[in-house]
Amino acid sequence: MTSSNDIRATFLDFFARNGHEVVPSAPLVPRNDPTLMFVNAGMVPFKNVFTGHEHRPYVRAASSQKCVRAGGKHNDLDNVGYTARHHTFFEMLGNFSFGDYFKDVAIENAWTLLTRDFGLPKEKLLVTVYHEDDEAASLWKRIAGLPDEKIIRIATDDNFWRMGDTGPCGPCSEIFYDHGPSIPGGPPGSPDEDGDRFIEIWNLVFMQFLEEPAGVRNPLPRPSIDTGMGLERFAAILQGKHDNYDTDTLRALILASAEVSHTDPDGAHKVSHRVIADHLRATSFLIADGVLPSNEGRGYVLRRIMRRAMRHAHRLGMREPFIYRLVPALTRQMGVAFPELPRAEALIVETLKLEEQKFAVMLERGLSLLEDEVQKLGSGEKLPGAVAFKLYDTYGFPLDLTEDALREQHRGLDHEGFTASMAEQKARARAAWAGSGDAATETVWLDLRDRLGGTEFLGYSTEESDASILAVVVNGAPAGRAEAGQEVALILNQTPFYAESGGQVGDTGTLTAPGVTIRVTDTQKKAGDLFVHYGTIEEGEIAPGNSVHAEVDHARRGAIRAHHSATHLLHEALRRALGPHVTQKGSLNAPDRLRFDISQPRPVTGAELRAVEREVNARIRENAAVETRLMTPDEAVKRGAMALFGEKYGDEVRVVSMGAGDAGRSAYSIELCGGTHVARTGDIGAFRILAESGVAAGIRRIEAVTGEAALAATEAETDLLEEAAAALKVAPAELPARIAALLEEKKRFERQVAELQRKLATGGAAAEIEEVAGIKFAARNLGEVSPRDLKSLADSILKSMGSGIAALVSTAESKASIVVAVSPDLTSANNAVTLVQAASGVVGGKGGGGRPDMAQAGGPDASKADEALAAVRALIKP
């Protein structure tokens, strides 16, 4: 059987032999394309090449592109698992010509590859062409020898491709495979075309027009080719399958799911195994490409995919995290073709496991609430949209999971009601936001940006300059003038002040003119590239058109530069210490500290932190030059620069390099960055890590300081050690041993105290045994005795009595803890649970629990401990 890996290799090798550049798959997160959530087709990474906005050193390309369709126009999520060919993740094989060859070569390449290299029988193939594309029909007849009946003309948009309302467009030609008359379905264009007999395997797009406004089409001067073949669909044909989920890669994941869950891969749980196999691929590749689960944007879509898979794991009977255990099986199948998968495997596993743990709690609660609501419905009645929205909004239960659960019961959902509830909530949120004044202020910045243009930033080369005031904003509105004492927001024509972005805080400083001083307390970026200087006029008055001298706080900027450059060294040191899965997830570069968030599935150990700290300080001591160059994003990435996930880059980027290179790299750290940096690494001075913590699933935070702050942190720790050593009368080096000895001594004393308390409690209780309704009863308020000792004390008292009831109360930590013990011969009339619940009510508790012979409870009101014991006494029956 031809494996999926072999098919991919054969496809790419064929086009490499035919002069194509084999381009690695781009990440699933599109670069500089806000119109797309994820890459959803093979041509997406080449979009700017087709439109002429980007130039590459080749005119022919081939790729196997990772794609995800799980939102927006291309949303296959709801169908995944229930059909033979729907997926959230798939591979798109494609070849592309950027103004080089056109229809004839594209058709010849496709026909040769399919019939010669892959060995498909010619009689099994037929094609469609756009009904006006006589040229393509003629070429298919000449090159492939296809008769007219196997060249089907289609008049719909299915055979005419557009990039958008305007832009490149052109006719398509689709190649179909005929499974034969034993499979139901008709040829494309027929009433039965939705059957499975004729399967589209390859789409050739002939970009030959430019769509202008008003629907005018003009010929492109250099026509191009874009083709796409779904690997999973094509593998099914070559492997003799009628279902993509029966192909080697997906089948291996289905079998792994069945093995771990101890269920039949093809029985009642068939759909669930298919969903898990598909969603495992989408989840793993998205995490490998930098997406982590969250409640917004791409992270939200990822979480939806993950939770749908987890819902099906629940249907398999899995109550513990399970899907994360399938990641190694995926890496074995696809890790060679996509090395980012094994690199990020640890992060994928840990992220999945944490999400599964959290989701298990939410799922049980959500399904229980949903079942309660369904019980209220009549036969065939839809679930009200307001109920579904409450599950979604209040309990975090996704709508698609509600729909999945209802589908199993053959019930519908009131989508209109859900949409209405969602709209009501958004309206409330909009009203609250508009009332805050933020909406009006944002409009001001947009209007000023349209009128004044962007601000020219001079701060890379200077920290002071002359400038003109273009606008004065007071209380969120443009003003003609402002005077001493007023808080203002100013727009200048040019500025040395850095506006907060990329994790670096905004500059502070002064704006001065004769008789005028403005203290700038912050600089922010609005409406894209409008720099807003916030501050207070200390003397004089200002108006638009005035000239000022802008001067940044030099010492503060220097400290910020040091921290920002240190984050670059820290980033690389962490990647080398922990692995290439480490990527930046957030940062703060302030004058007094730095904060750096990374993708990392587990806490960073103390030993690892010390190694990273030593590495960064070694690079600082090198005192290597920090170099900044401007280049295209593609050139930067080729040079080894790290492009940060979520950042938007223009046609030209700043690449910051620092530290001596090794292992074929031109520098130790190479990153795309728009911030300000030191001139040499030695200018950082020193580096000290202060803390490491978790901030979200799969994300760890490093906090550190540089320069004098790093030295101060070291001195403070030294002073603390010396103070502790002096208090314990040992040398600092002997502190660990002395502390260990003290802790052991403390444990010994605690054991002795507990034993003395136990003896006092049991001894005193024995002396105070009373008789109630003919039954021995011992009741004691034990004060500060630990609540965890109450059960053993009650048991000891009961043993000393032989037959009877013991009730004990602890008031440690100003709370009442109660235990009631009843000998077995008395439990039929005196249940310990009933007795302790009565006591709990007295001290403000909400009940209690346990067994008929031993139960415990508690409450916040320790002052009523004796009354609680009296409540037990009052309920004792003979």
Curated annotation (Swiss-Prot):
Enzyme Commission designation: 6.1.1.7
Co-factor(s): Zn(2+)
Note accompanying the cofactor annotation: Binds 1 zinc ion per subunit.
GO molecular function: alanine-tRNA ligase activity; aminoacyl-tRNA deacylase activity; ATP binding; tRNA binding; zinc ion binding
Reactions catalysed according to its record: tRNA(Ala) + L-alanine + ATP = L-alanyl-tRNA(Ala) + AMP + diphosphate
Gene Ontology cellular component terms for the protein in this record: cytosol
Subcellular location: Cytoplasm
Coiled coil regions in record: none
Record family assignment: Belongs to the class-II aminoacyl-tRNA synthetase family.
Name under which the protein is recorded: Alanine--tRNA ligase
Organism: Acidiphilium cryptum (strain JF-5)
Name of the coding gene: alaS
